[in-house]
From Swiss-Prot:
Active site per UniProt: C391
PROSITE patterns hit by this protein: SAM_MT_RNA_M5U, TRAM, TRMA_1
Binding-site list for [4Fe-4S] cluster: C75, C81, C84, C161
Positions contributing to S-adenosyl-L-methionine binding: Q266, Y295, E316, N364
TRAM domain segment(s): 4-62
EC number: 2.1.1.-
Class of enzymatic activity (EC top level): transferase
PANTHER family assigned: RNA M5U METHYLTRANSFERASE, TRNA (URACIL(54)-C(5))-METHYLTRANSFERASE
InterPro entries reported in the protein's UniProt record: MeTrfase_TrmA_AS (IPR030390), NA-bd_OB-fold (IPR012340), SAM-dependent_MTases_sf (IPR029063), TRAM_dom (IPR002792), U5_MeTrfase_fam (IPR010280)
Similarity comment text for this entry: Belongs to the class I-like SAM-binding methyltransferase superfamily. RNA M5U methyltransferase family.
Organism of this sequence: Protochlamydia amoebophila (strain UWE25)
Any one Gene Ontology BP term: RNA processing
Short name of any one Pfam family annotated for the protein: tRNA_U5-meth_tr
Name of this protein: Uncharacterized RNA methyltransferase pc0248
Length: 434
């Protein structure tokens, strides 16, 4: 039926469901049209902006009759900014969508038998993010900060972000004022990560292609002018400036972790703590003695498990993360842990050869999931149990379809609402050898 639709055609109808990614689904003569920022039950008019063989994408033109599932989004940039997809939906609808996204994806892509998925809901749905990364665009011989728009190209300049801070918190406005003073004669772009410290201050991490020496003084003056900044890290491929104290120390359970804004850390402190507690609880139940923690970052999970008396080996390719993991091990006086730097697919076989009795393997890969070679190595090693933590249901389903074909079964599956107001969700799966 694609011949019935052309670009800019307006279509009227009802949104019947949400697709993976959060867009509403409108069916037009059996043809699927995805309409972002709509809710099931909405009566709408939309305009076609993209046509593919099996579906089309449209933009909302008019909301004729709003769904009862709608709420008023508090963010002034919602619908333009590409960061949040679900602010217009009430909390229960968001949770239902995420549960459905996980179970449907595991069944459709993985062809898996999925036990009932438990959802760990977030108590904090706003101002929850530990850090944000803003894009810096050249603007009037200086810079402007913001998020990439829904067109995946334009910059939406912002002065607030309600999933990071309260709406009237001035921190982003202060940042915009500061970066507008930075000369940018080469008209380069960059990135800025803003990390909350536990002392109500912020750490800034700038990344540029090259550094303008004239700006070093301005960064130093910023710490004096804005006491809310505790430290600034400025990096390029060839240089790094460390101004003030760009290191964060955060307490998780009874341990102290030191890191910089460049390190990966889960963004929702409350929800990530539930995940760490779940992993610790499982390892006690399983009576695991030797544990491999793959993609271990700067060692939070590894060190929490080591504090329980488990022997843990963490593997991570990022050299800075491994350096902080080792520092955190010394900081917390934990001897039952070692950290190895390198690609998992290269280090893992060596590690398994030297540690022949690994009880449990924990994997927390990036969005792309596990490589085929890592899956092959794990299937050869056949640990009794695996814990797979994922923020991408599609790659989780792909990997589990291989692992669970003959060797493993899903023993437990828990979802964590780590990213309220967005379409993203974190999943923890406990796999047991058949």
């Amino acid at each position: 039926m694609t011949h019935l639709l052309t670009i800019h055609t307006q279509v009227e109808g009802e949104i019947t469901a949400l697709a993976f990614g959060g867009a509403g689904i409108l069916r037009y003569h059996g043809f699927v049209i995805f309409v972002p920022f709509t809710a099931p039950g909405d009566q709408i008019i939309c305009r076609i902006i993209e046509i593919k063989k099996s579906f089309a994408v449209a933009e909302l033109v008019k909301l004729k009759q709003p769904s009862s599932l709608r709420v008023q989004p508090p963010c002034p940039y919602f619908g333009k900014c590409g960061g949040c997809q679900l602010q217009h939906l009430n909390e229960q609808t968001q949770l239902n969508y995420k549960l459905t996204a996980i179970t449907d994806t595991l069944k459709r892509i993985g062809h898996l038998k999925v036990p009932s998925v438990e959802m760990n809901t977030a108590q904090l749905n706003w101002a929850y993010r530990r850090h944000i990364t803003l894009h810096l665009k050249s603007f009037n011989q200086s810079f402007q900060a913001g998020y990439i728009a829904t067109d995946h190209f334009s910059l939406i300049s912002i002065d607030t972000c309600p999933i990071f801070n309260n709406l009237h918190d001035p921190i982003i406005s202060i940042l915009q004022k500061f970066i507008s003073t930075l000369p940018n004669p080469n008209q380069q772009d960059g990135r800025l990560t803003l990390l909350k410290n536990q002392n109500s201050q912020y750490i800034l991490s700038f990344q540029f292609c090259s550094l303008n020496e004239l700006n070093r003084i301005l960064f130093q003056e910023a710490l004096e002018k804005y006491p809310i900044f505790s430290g600034i890290l400025v990096t390029s491929p060839k240089k790094q400036w460390i101004i003030g104290n760009p290191y964060s120390e955060q307490k998780i359970e009874n341990l102290i972790f030191r890191f910089t804004p460049q390190a990966f850390i889960q963004n929702h402190p409350e929800q990530s703590l539930y995940i760490y507690k779940k992993i610790c609880s499982l390892t006690i139940q399983l009576k695991s003695k030797k544990i491999l923690d793959l993609y271990c970052g700067f060692g939070i999970t590894s060190l929490l498990l080591a504090s329980q008396g488990h022997f843990v080996t963490g593997i991570e390719y990022n050299s800075d993360a491994i350096r902080f993991a080792k520092e955190n091990s010394k900081l917390n006086h934990l001897p039952h842990v070692e950290f190895l730097e390198g690609d998992v697919e290269k280090i893992l076989p060596i590690c398994l050869k030297s540690q022949k009795c690994v009880d449990l393997v924990i994997v927390n890969p990036p969005r792309i999931g596990l490589s085929k070679s890592v899956i092959k190595i794990l299937m050869s090693a056949l640990p009794e149990d695996m814990i797979y933590i994922s923020c991408m249901p599609s790659t989780l389903a792909r990997d589990l379809s291989i692992l669970c074909e003959d060797l493993y079964e899903i023993h437990e599956c828990t979802a964590y609402d780590m990213f309220p107001q967005t379409s993203h969700v974190e999943t923890l799966v406990h796999l047991k050898k058949v």
